[in-house]
Amino acid sequence: MSKLPVLISIPHGGSQIPPEISGRVCITPKDQFEDGDALTQDIYGVKNEVLAFVEGNIARAFVDLNRDVNDRPPKNPDGVVKSMTCLGKPIYQSGHELDENLTEMLLQKYYHPYHGLIREILDSNSEVQLMLDCH
């Protein structure tokens, strides 16, 4: 059976805490779970049936792969790199919030490669007819 001409993107299904910030975090696993799109990998478990499948492994509470790269704290505490969860809970211990260097490192290591992979797939695979951003 041929694969469907679809690219599936799952930006909010990850659960990992970036190791670079693990000692700064104060939210609980429950907070982290509530801030993401739980079970999206299971709901959209069609990896073997589509031409391309891209999923984030970092939890949305830390790097939101579905935001504009310039949507950042303090203007938006629930932006691309967060200072608060979507429910308004501080993510980092007081005095251990992200600085500009750490923010840029997280974007370079997690955000840009995710979007680069999507762009590469779309640019190099003319068979992909539809991209679905799944939540």
Which residue stretches match the model-derived regions?
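N-terminal catalytic or cofactor-binding beta/alpha core of small enzyme domains
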Residues: 1-131
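Acidic/histidine-rich, metal-coordinating catalytic segments
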Residues: 133-135
